[in-house]
Every structure is written in structure tokens, then in C-alpha cells.
């Protein structure tokens, strides 16, 4: 009593306390960062190594394996995958959530150093690492185009000037430059001219290497001066290499230009990038795992004018893709939803109380509670994101509940003629314990979420804490500010109703009277109600088992990614044509705003595309509908497939895949893996639950297998080293010398001119100079035949791995796909040597599925414990929790009605319902117990009276919660696919529970009371006997 009086009789102190809470919240709001979701990125580090010309199998065995053995010893590595392709190896290390990325990077560098002695000596550079996940979609893509500068020059500007500057911006983890390669002097050899002059490819390589040398020359001194010696020992351009003498034939000089075409070109001509229909260089910017995407993008945008000034005016620097606009739009939608929810909740209060003065009180309490929460969010290191703002939206219904319960009880005493301050004190004292019970039991629901580990726990923690803090502040406000305002603002008389509201009042009275009559009948037919309650429990189980499930709702971020997978033997020229064809099909779609793409590098038969859709207001279809439409058009392109997927804010795993979900096959027997992977992939491709089924196993690339006749080689004076060097010189784009410039270093690249390598007859033109100086054709000591070879070799851990990726067709859920894959694996009879498991997001979904039921049970158990402690009873908490089955049925039915799968967001809704619907039972039980203790009423009379007295606040709190969630259901625009499942779950659960619990709770209360009496009599009878 004294606690409540302290605030009621000291209005200035109470007001200032509330003002202080509000001001702290405003300051916190201004300093909170903005993000699409809570920080849930796994720490990921990518290690890259190169050995130009090496086959994928050579890269896997000689580069990937030694590095994997060393990297695998690092503490905290949760997953290690690698992919080796032509001349390149990439290892992805995913660490535990709690692993510091900087500490992990130091360990990675130490592991690379430890493995250095085991790596091939011919590697042009040491392995490097980056603190970024290559499978993440870029947060921003910049493009460089020009009508006057070549692609190589544009690439040079991008990699030498722009990329290093952008990499230094806070939050940037990696800047990947694509679309071409660095400038280089390319030497295209003419095999016939070399043969005619008696010059070997090694002669040319040695001559060029010796002619371009950068060594110190020293200095000259006399008594008074010092001269630095400088020579023309370096060759910089193709024109300077052209007259280089590489050999003498019969006394005549053979110059490089006589046997080769020398051009200023690029290091790797098998690279191409485009934006819309124009050649372009792409800068794909990815953030650090712990970085805030909005802050990082804003920082990059702020530096763009400076970046533009560092490159020539003839180069056009543009933003081709930016993830931030849709994130900002989504958050604006949530903020609007929050404002609408607050307005609707206050409208509900006004309709029930029919008093402007009384409505002002919750209209003040709600904003104070919500705004004050921002301060706690800032102190906890949270952000303004979709989940935290949804928590505040849902909190509007919760925080007003406390104020409603206090306000309604005080108003009841005022209408009975009590003085305002006395009514405030008495009314608050009566319901103080009720409000405390409702708030503590609601917070208790979220305790299991706070203890939940892994990605789901990290994702839901911010939601749970935000909502719990809002409820805590609401509890304080409802017991301090609300009774004070009631005592000083409300009058000791019945409120004057506006004429237009009298009808609503009469309707509410009629509704209450009808409820009283129906309740009397129900209390006389308790068995029927008991059967209904048991039926709802059974229906819950059946609905949960049968409802489609997924991990997270499919988002429409306005950005699509596309992976191109072509025939494994396709040439680069043909692949570039495929890229152009696919980009034209997509660019012509009316919903597409911008398209960028690239192909080439170590995997010629693959490419990537990044598609920006028009804003949601300018298109009628969702991203998935657009993908479905484009899929039909893209299927007509022969020889290649383009797999599209909508970019999501949550991406798990480091595998770069052409679809959203992955299923990984592992084996220690590579032959078994290569045998079974095609069978499994073909089987999965026939399943209607899966779409865009593809695999990263590519072991049918065209290969020319050369077989040396070692006896003949020995007789002719040729060793294998010389023969292999010939092939590398001719076909490996071999980097034979370095050109040093002030800003960068460039290469001299040698190969047989592409004009002479159009078919396998090019091998017949190759020759080796033996130890006697004779030119020996390759065909004299080698035979060749076409064969198949892998384009890439993949590992997970230290096992061979193949990853099958898939998307979900419209109307199918991840649970449908998972079950279908499990059935298919069983039907195929896959041997034990080949192990299959879900990876990435699909793996997290499997883990979450296993813990969902446990989480719900833990929440119910926690609420039971808290209620048991508060009521000092084993029975009353069961009465209160009997409201849950009807809410569960309503939520699951609503999800099925709206064709929404059960996701992590829907799970949040179920958890919230556990806290919401029990409030009605708490109000009933509290007043029934009070009536039994002090009113000398029978249990049936007490619960009947409690139901009637609490009918108005029950309707108010339920409708407040319902109208608080309704804008989530009706919201459209950006991010609505995240909000709607939460709103659907809550609204469906509230409607069903409101219809049933007004009757089931009194019946359960009487059942347990009779059960208690029956057990309390038995000991007495035993003593009498």
C-alpha cells in the first residue's frame, strides 16, 4: 500500500520519473544503429591460393590438403570446406559464434605459415586470407565503364586505386574486383615460326626473363660527388619487347616479333563483366561478419565523390546494386505499423471506457513504456531492425494491458462513488498482484529463448530482451504513473458517453449478459467442455505434425542472385555469349531495374549475375513470382542453366551455391562419391518438392590426356620436366616476367597464340629442343587421347564432398523438401561409404526443428514455475495454462488458412501466445480466489462472479493485443513477409482462445477445486478409521 501511495500522492516526482525514462529512450533511439535483422553472421574467413596452370586434382592434393590439415587444428572451427579448380584453391573456415574474428585471423595466418613448407615451390605468391564470407551477397556493387579506356585499364584503376581505399572503410570485409584482369604484356607464339627458326619455347621464356631485370646497380663516387647507376634493364610495353633478340640462327638475329605477336593486353583474357548491355568492371563489396550493413553502405556512399575524383573523368563510376534502400523501406514499414498499432490500441481503450480523460492515461503510458525501451536496447548493443521493431509493435498490446487492468479497476471504484485518490490507491492495491503476475509470467516465457544457443538463439535473443524490457517498464509505469494520473485526472462519477458511443456501450452490456447466461449453461455441462478441451490438445498435436515448416520466411529484398552453370566442356567465348543471352532475357523483364554479371577465371563454365528489382511500389509481383516467370524463359536457352534465388538477410555457411539450400554428400572413397552423386542428383531432380536442383560436382570436363613414351624420350634426350615445361609455356598463360610500375606490378604472359590452338592439331605443332639441339616434335614421344576430368575438386573437413543445391517451388516448404530427400535417399539404397546431410540454412532448420517442441515445453514449464511461486499452489498454474491449447489451435489453423509455413517467426508468435492468453485466466483466477477468501462464496459462485466482473478488462486486453497485431497481418510493402507470420499466429490464436477460454477456464478451475477437495478428504477418512 505504501509503495503505491508514494507515487499517487507525489505527482511531480512520478511525472519527472516518467519524463526521465522517456528522455533516456529518445537519446537511445537517436544512437541506435539500423539493420535488417539482429547480428547473426557466423565469423567466416576465406583462404585463397593459386598455382597457375595446375589441374583441379593437383590443386586439391598439393595445395588444399596441406592447408586443410594445418587449418583444421584451429580452435573454434565449426566447418571447413574447400574448392579447387584450375590453378586456384579456396578454403572457407566457419567459426563458432563466440569466436573473435580478429583472433581467428591471427590463428589462420599462423596455420598458413606452418603449412608453407609443404606447399609447391612454384606458387607465385603465398596463400592469403580475407575476413569475409564469399557466399554472402554483396552489400553494394560498383561498376566502372568507359568508351575510351580498355577493360584492363579499368580493372587496373579498380584494383589499384578504388579497391584498397574501399577496403579501409569501417565495416568492409572484402572488395572483389571482377570482369577482367590486370594489364599485361601478352606474348602469343607462332609454333611454325619457332620451329623454322629452331627456337624452343623455353628459349623464348628465358630470353624474356633475362631481358627484363630489376636489380640494384650500385653507385660511383669520387672525392666530392656520388653518382647512382641506372640502366635501361627493364622493358615496360609491348613495343619494347617486340624487337628483343631471343636467338641467333645462322648468324642472323631472331627477334621476338618474328616468332610471336606481342600486345598490351591483360593477364587473363578469359574474364568478362557486364552491366546491363555494356562491358564493365565490377567491384563487389562484402561486409565484415560483425559490421552493420547500413552504416557500412553509408560510409561507402560518403566516399564515392572522393573515389570518383581519383580516376579519370572519362571513366563512369556507378552504383549498380545497393542493399540498403529495401532495408530502410522495410524498417519504415515496421515503424508505420508500430504507430498504427499504438493508435488502434488507444482506440480500443476509448471505445470501452468511453471517456476522453480515461483514454489519455494509457495513451501516455504506452509511449513512455515503448520509448523507454530504446535506452535499454542501446545499452545492450542492439539495433533497430525488423525483429526488435516487431517486438515493440507486439508490445503495444502488452504494455496497454497492464494500464487497462489498473485503469479499469480504478474506474469501477469511481463509478461506485469512491473519491479519486482513494479509488486509485484501492484499485491499484487490488490488482497490483494481478499485474505483477501477468508481467512476470509473460517475461518467463522468454527465458528459454535467452538460453537458446546457435543461430536461432542469437536471432531471437534481441526480440525477447526488447519485449521483456518493454513489459518491465510497462509494469513500473502501470503501478506508478497510471494510478497517479487516475487519481488526479478522473472524476468520481460515471463518464458521460457521447451519443455515437452509447450504442457500443449497450452492445457491450448485452454481450456481457449473453456471456453470463451461456456461462451458467456451461458450468452445468462441464464434461462436454472437458471433451472440447481434450480435443483441442489432440488437434494441436495433429496440426503441428502436419503443418508445413521452414526455417525463416522467404524474404523479398528486391535483389536476386543468379548462378550460371554451362556444359563442362564449353569454351570461354561461348560462355561469354551465354552470359549476354541470359542478361538480355532478364533485362527485358518489366520488373527488373538493373543487371550485372561476370564469367571466367578458374571456372570457365560458370558465371554469376546480380539483379536489382524495381521497388515494391513499382511492381505487383513478389521476388519469387518473378523468379517463377523468368525460370520458364531461361529454360529455353540450350547448353547452360541460370539458377535464380532471392537474396536473403540470413545466409548460413560458406559454400557458394546456385540455390538457397544445400544437401552435402561426403565420402572417403572418391570413386564411390563420383558414382553415386549423379544418381542422387537425378533422383532429387524428379521430386516435385524441389526446384533448380544442381550440383558442384563437375567431373566430366573435356581433357586431352597425353601419354609419354619414356623409353623414346630417354633415347631422344628429353626428360619429363622439359616436356611439361613445353605444355605450360604453350597453353598455361604462363607468367614469365614482372613489370614494375609505381602503383602496381604487372606480368608478361606467354602462350601459343590462340589462332593456333583452335583444335587438338595444335599439339602436333609443339616441339622440344633436346640436349643435342634438335627440334623433336611432341608427337614423336607422346600420344594423346580425349578423356574426362574434373573441373573442380571439393572437400569438407578432409573428406571428398559434393553439394547438391536446390530451391523450393512455390507452395512447397523446407520440411516438405527435407522429408522428400530423406525418402529418396532411403529408396536409392545409398551405401554407407557415402554419407548425406543437410548443410547451411537447411542444416540449421533441421537443428531448429529438433528443438522447437522442447523450447515450447520449456516455456510452458517456466511459466508454470513462476505462477506456482506467485500463487503458492501446484493447481492454479494448471488452471491458467489450460488456456494454451485453444490458442495453439487458432494459431496453426490461421497459418494453414493463409498458406504460411510454420517458421521461426511463427514460433515467436506461439511463444507470445503462451504469455498473452494466460492473462485472461490470471484475471479470472485472481478475482475468484479473492471472492472465495473474503466473500464467503462457493467456488462456482466465485468463478462465475469473477468471469462477469473481469469480462470487460478481458475483452479490452484481448482486443488491444489483437488490434496491436492486426497491422502486422494487413501490412504490405517491403519486409511484410517477415511481419505477416507473426501477426497471423497471434491474431489466430487470440480469436480462438477468446472464444474458448472464457468457458474452459472456469470449468478447469472447478475441476481442480473438486479434485483438491477429494484428495483433502482421504487423509481425514483414514484417521477416523
From Swiss-Prot:
GO molecular function: xenobiotic transmembrane transporter activity
InterPro entries (alphabetical): AcrB_DN_DC_subdom (IPR027463), Acrflvin-R (IPR001036), Multidrug-R_MdtC (IPR023931)
Record flagged with keyword rRNA-binding: no
Coiled coil segments of this chain: none
Keyword Signal attached: no
Location of the protein in the cell: Cell inner membrane
Keywords, alphabetical: Cell inner membrane, Cell membrane, Membrane, Transmembrane, Transmembrane helix, Transport
Transmembrane stretches, start-end: 3-23, 333-353, 360-380, 387-407, 431-451, 463-483, 528-548, 853-873, 875-895, 897-917, 953-973, 984-1004
GO cellular component: plasma membrane
Disulfide bond sites: none
Membrane topology, record value: Multi-pass membrane protein
Inducing factors: The mdtABC operon is transcriptionally activated by BaeR.
UniProt xrefs under HAMAP family: MdtC (MF_01424)
Self-association state and partner proteins as the record states: Part of a tripartite efflux system composed of MdtA, MdtB and MdtC. MdtC forms a heteromultimer with MdtB.
Family: Belongs to the resistance-nodulation-cell division (RND) (TC 2.A.6) family. MdtC subfamily.
Role this protein plays: The MdtABC tripartite complex confers resistance against novobiocin and deoxycholate.
Protein name: Multidrug resistance protein MdtC
Organism the protein comes from: Escherichia coli (strain UTI89 / UPEC)
Amino acid at each position: 500500500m505504501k509503495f503505491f501511495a508514494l507515487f499517487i500522492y507525489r505527482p511531480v516526482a512520478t511525472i519527472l520519473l516518467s519524463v526521465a525514462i522517456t528522455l533516456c529512450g529518445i537519446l537511445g533511439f537517436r544512437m541506435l544503429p539500423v539493420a535488417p535483422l539482429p547480428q547473426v553472421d557466423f565469423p567466416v574467413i576465406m583462404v585463397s591460393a593459386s598455382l597457375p596452370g595446375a589441374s583441379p586434382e593437383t590443386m586439391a592434393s598439393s595445395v588444399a590438403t596441406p592447408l586443410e590439415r594445418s587449418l583444421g587444428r584451429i580452435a573454434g572451427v565449426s566447418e571447413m570446406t574447400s574448392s579447387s579448380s584450375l590453378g586456384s584453391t579456396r578454403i572457407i573456415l566457419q567459426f563458432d559464434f563466440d569466436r573473435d574474428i580478429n583472433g581467428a585471423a591471427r590463428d589462420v595466418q599462423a596455420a598458413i605459415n606452418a603449412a608453407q613448407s609443404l606447399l609447391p615451390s612454384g606458387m607465385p605468391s603465398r596463400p592469403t586470407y580475407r575476413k569475409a564470407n564469399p557466399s554472402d551477397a554483396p552489400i553494394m556493387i560498383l561498376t566502372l565503364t568507359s568508351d575510351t579506356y580498355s577493360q584492363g585499364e579499368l580493372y587496373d584503376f579498380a584494383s589499384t586505386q578504388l579497391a584498397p581505399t574501399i577496403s579501409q572503410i569501417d565495416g568492409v570485409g572484402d572488395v572483389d574486383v571482377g570482369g577482367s584482369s590486370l594489364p599485361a604484356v601478352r606474348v602469343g607464339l607462332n609454333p611454325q615460326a619457332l620451329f623454322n627458326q629452331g627456337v624452343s619455347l623455353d628459349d623464348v621464356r628465358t630470353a624474356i626473363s633475362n631481358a627484363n631485370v630489376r636489380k640494384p646497380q650500385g653507385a660511383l663516387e669520387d672525392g666530392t660527388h656520388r653518382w647512382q647507376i641506372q640502366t635501361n634493364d627493364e622493358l615496360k610495353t609491348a613495343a619494347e619487347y617486340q624487337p628483343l633478340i631471343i636467338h641467333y640462327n645462322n648468324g642472323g638475329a631472331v627477334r621476338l616479333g618474328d616468332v610471336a605477336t606481342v600486345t598490351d593486353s591483360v593477364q587473363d583474357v578469359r574474364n568478362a563483366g557486364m552491366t546491363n548491355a555494356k562491358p564493365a568492371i565490377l567491384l563487389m563489396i562484402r561486409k565484415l561478419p560483425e559490421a552493420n550493413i547500413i552504416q557500412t553502405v553509408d560510409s561507402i556512399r560518403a566516399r564515392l565523390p572522393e573515389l570518383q575524383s581519383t580516376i579519370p573523368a572519362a571513366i563512369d563510376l556507378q552504383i549498380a546494386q545497393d542493399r540498403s534502400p529495401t532495408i530502410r523501406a522495410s524498417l519504415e514499414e515496421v515503424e508505420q505499423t508500430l504507430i498504427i498499432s499504438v493508435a488502434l490500441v488507444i482506440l480500443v481503450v476509448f471505445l470501452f471506457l468511453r471517456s476522453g480523460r480515461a483514454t489519455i492515461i494509457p495513451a501516455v503510458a504506452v509511449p513512455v513504456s515503448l520509448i523507454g525501451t530504446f535506452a535499454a536496447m542501446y545499452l545492450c548493443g542492439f539495433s533497430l531492425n525488423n525483429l526488435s521493431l516487431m517486438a515493440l509493435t507486439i508490445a503495444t498490446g502488452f504494455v496497454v494491458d497492464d494500464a487497462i487492468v489498473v485503469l479499469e479497476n480504478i474506474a469501477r471504484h469511481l463509478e461506485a462513488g469512491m473519491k479519486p485518490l482513494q479509488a486509485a490507491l484501492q484499485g491499484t492495491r487490488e490488482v497490483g498482484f494481478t499485474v505483477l503476475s501477468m508481467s512476470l509470467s509473460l517475461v518467463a516465457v522468454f527465458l528459454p529463448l535467452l538460453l537458446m544457443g546457435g543461430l536461432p538463439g542469437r536471432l531471437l535473443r534481441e526480440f525477447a530482451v526488447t519485449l521483456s524490457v518493454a513489459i518491465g517498464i510497462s509494469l513500473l509505469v502501470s503501478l506508478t504513473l497510471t494510478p497517479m494520473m487516475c487519481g488526479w485526472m478522473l472524476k468520481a462519477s460515471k463518464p458521460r458517453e457521447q451519443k455515437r458511443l452509447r450504442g457500443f456501450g449497450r452492445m457491450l452490456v448485452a454481450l456481457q449478459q449473453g456471456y453470463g447466461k451461456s456461462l451458467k449453461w456451461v458450468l452445468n455441462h462441464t464434461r462436454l467442455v472437458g471433451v472440447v478441451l481434450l480435443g483441442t490438445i489432440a488437434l494441436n498435436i495433429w496440426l503441428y505434425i502436419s503443418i508445413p515448416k521452414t526455417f525463416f520466411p522467404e524474404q523479398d529484398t528486391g535483389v536476386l542472385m543468379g548462378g550460371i552453370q554451362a556444359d563442362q566442356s564449353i569454351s570461354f567465348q561461348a560462355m561469354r555469349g551465354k552470359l549476354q543471352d541470359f542478361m538480355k532475357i532478364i533485362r527485358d523483364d518489366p520488373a527488373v531495374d538493373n543487371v550485372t554479371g561476370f564469367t571466367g577465371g578458374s571456372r570457365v563454365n560458370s558465371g554469376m549475375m546480380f539483379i536489382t528489382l524495381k521497388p515494391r511500389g513499382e511492381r505487383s509481383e513478389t521476388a519469387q513470382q518473378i523468379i517463377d516467370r523468368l525460370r520458364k524463359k531461361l529454360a529455353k536457352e540450350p547448353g547452360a542453366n541460370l539458377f535464380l534465388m532471392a537474396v536473403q538477410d540470413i545466409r548460413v555457411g560458406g559454400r557458394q551455391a546456385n540455390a538457397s539450400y544445400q544437401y552435402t554428400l561426403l565420402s572417403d572413397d572418391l570413386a564411390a562419391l563420383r558414382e553415386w552423386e549423379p544418381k542422387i542428383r537425378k533422383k532429387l531432380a524428379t521430386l516435385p518438392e524441389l526446384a533448380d536442383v544442381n550440383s558442384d560436382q563437375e567431373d566430366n570436363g573435356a581433357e586431352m590426356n597425353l601419354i609419354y613414351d619414356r623409353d623414346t624420350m630417354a633415347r631422344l634426350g628429353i626428360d619429363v620436366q622439359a616436356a611439361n615445361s613445353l605444355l605450360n609455356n604453350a597453353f598455361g598463360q604462363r607468367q614469365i616476367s614482372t613489370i614494375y610500375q609505381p602503383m602496381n606490378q604487372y606480368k608478361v604472359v606467354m602462350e601459343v597464340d590462340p589462332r593456333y590452338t583452335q583444335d587438338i592439331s595444335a599439339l602436333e605443332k609443339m616441339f622440344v629442343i633436346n640436349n643435342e639441339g634438335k627440334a623433336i616434335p611432341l608427337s614423336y614421344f607422346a600420344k594423346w587421347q580425349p578423356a574426362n576430368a574434373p573441373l573442380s575438386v571439393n572437400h569438407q573437413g578432409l573428406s571428398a564432398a559434393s553439394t547438391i543445391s536446390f530451391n523450393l517451388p512455390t507452395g512447397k516448404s523446407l520440411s516438405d523438401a527435407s522429408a522428400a530427400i530423406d525418402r529418396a535417399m532411403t529408396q536409392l539404397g545409398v551405401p554407407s561409404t557415402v554419407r548425406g546431410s543437410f548443410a547451411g540454412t537447411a542444416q540449421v532448420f533441421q537443428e531448429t526443428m529438433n528443438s522447437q517442441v522442447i523450447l515450447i515445453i520449456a516455456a510452458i514449464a517456466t511459466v508454470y514455475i513462476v505462477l506456482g511461486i506467485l500463487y503458492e499452489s501446484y493447481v492454479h498454474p494448471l488452471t491458467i495454462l489450460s488456456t494454451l491449447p485453444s490458442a495453439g489451435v487458432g494459431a496453426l489453423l490461421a497459418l494453414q488458412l493463409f498458406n504460411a509455413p510454420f517458421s521461426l517467426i511463427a514460433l515467436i508468435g506461439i511463444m507470445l501466445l503462451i504469455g498473452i492468453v494466460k492473462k485472461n485466466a490470471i484475471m479470472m483466477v485472481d478475482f475468484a480466489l479473492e471472492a472465495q477468501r473474503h466473500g464467503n462464496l462457493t467456488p462456482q459462485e466465485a468463478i462465475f462472479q469473477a468471469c462477469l466482473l473481469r469480462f470487460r478488462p478481458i475483452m479490452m486486453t484481448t482486443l488491444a493485443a489483437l488490434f496491436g497485431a492486426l497491422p502486422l497481418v494487413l501490412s504490405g510493402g517491403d519486409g511484410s513477409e517477415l511481419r505477416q507470420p507473426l501477426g497471423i499466429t497471434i491474431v489466430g490464436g487470440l480469436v480462438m482462445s477468446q472464444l474458448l477460454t472464457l468457458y474452459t477456464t472456469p470449468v478447469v478451475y472447478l475441476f481442480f477445486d473438486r479434485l483438491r477437495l477429494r484428495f483433502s478428504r482421504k487423509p481425514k477418512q483414514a484417521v477416523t478409521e
